[in-house]
């Protein structure tokens, strides 16, 4: 009987040790995801600011005007390349992730963040710097709270995914339509729905990243998962920020 009790206790200790190892591995994985995501946001912010500084200047009347570089980037067909290049890269990264080395995937992720930074320099032309800063910190606080909830909640958020993806496609379609309608009311509605959708996606993606973690993954697979998880959260944060900026940002 005593041998049986010892065997049971030993099995329980092994199970507890394995659970602790998985928990520690999951924490390390999530920290890596958040570090990649935060670094990419930093790259985007720095590149956007530097691009703006080189693309615009203030004239004698105190008005913001484009420099020759700014006219090239935002006043010609190149503006379409600035939009399409990051989009093409993120699709390539998503489709080819299984065939890429972890380091290559990470490099492409940061290249994407830099390209998007060039494109997002235009927000400094439309909004005041103080309101951009304010909305950034609001977005960061909201993102942190939503991601924490997605990580800690016991509720299964899987069912939310289909509705959120449908909402995302609805936002894209409505935004394309509004390019022609130029309706302020529709833009306001799109922004509100966008905030709700990307808030939900933040929690949903966080839980999905957590559930996709596997302690048996090797370094390459774990690295790929970290990059794709960081990319998902990065896109959630950037779009949440842009939607909030459209709602409460102060235009120049």
Locations of regions flagged by a protein language model:
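A hydrophobic alpha-helical transmembrane-helix feature that marks the membrane cores
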Residues: 1-252
């Amino acid at each position: 009987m005593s041998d049986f009790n010892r065997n049971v206790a030993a099995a329980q200790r092994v199970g507890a040790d394995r659970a602790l190892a998985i928990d520690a591995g999951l924490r390390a994985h999530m920290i890596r995801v958040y570090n990649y995501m935060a670094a990419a946001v930093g790259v985007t912010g720095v590149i956007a600011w530097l691009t703006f500084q080189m693309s615009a200047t203030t004239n004698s009347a105190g008005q913001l005007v484009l420099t020759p570089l700014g006219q090239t980037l935002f006043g010609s067909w190149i503006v379409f390349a600035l939009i399409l290049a990051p989009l093409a890269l993120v699709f390539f990264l998503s489709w080819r992730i299984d065939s890429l080395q972890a380091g290559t995937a990470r490099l492409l992720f940061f290249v994407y963040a830099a390209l998007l930074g060039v494109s997002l320099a235009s927000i400094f032309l439309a909004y005041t710097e103080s309101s951009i800063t304010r909305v950034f910190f609001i977005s960061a606080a909201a993102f942190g709270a939503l991601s924490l909830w997605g990580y800690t909640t016991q509720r299964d958020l899987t069912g939310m995914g289909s509705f959120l993806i449908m909402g995302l496609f609805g936002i894209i379609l409505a935004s394309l339509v509004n390019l022609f309608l130029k309706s302020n009311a529709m833009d306001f509605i799109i922004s509100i729905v966008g905030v709700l959708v990307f808030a939900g996606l933040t929690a949903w993606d966080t839980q999905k990243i957590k559930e996709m973690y596997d302690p048996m993954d090797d370094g390459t697979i774990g690295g790929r998962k970290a990059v794709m998880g960081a990319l998902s959260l990065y896109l959630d944060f950037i779009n949440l920020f842009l939607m909030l900026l459209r709602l409460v940002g102060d235009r120049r």
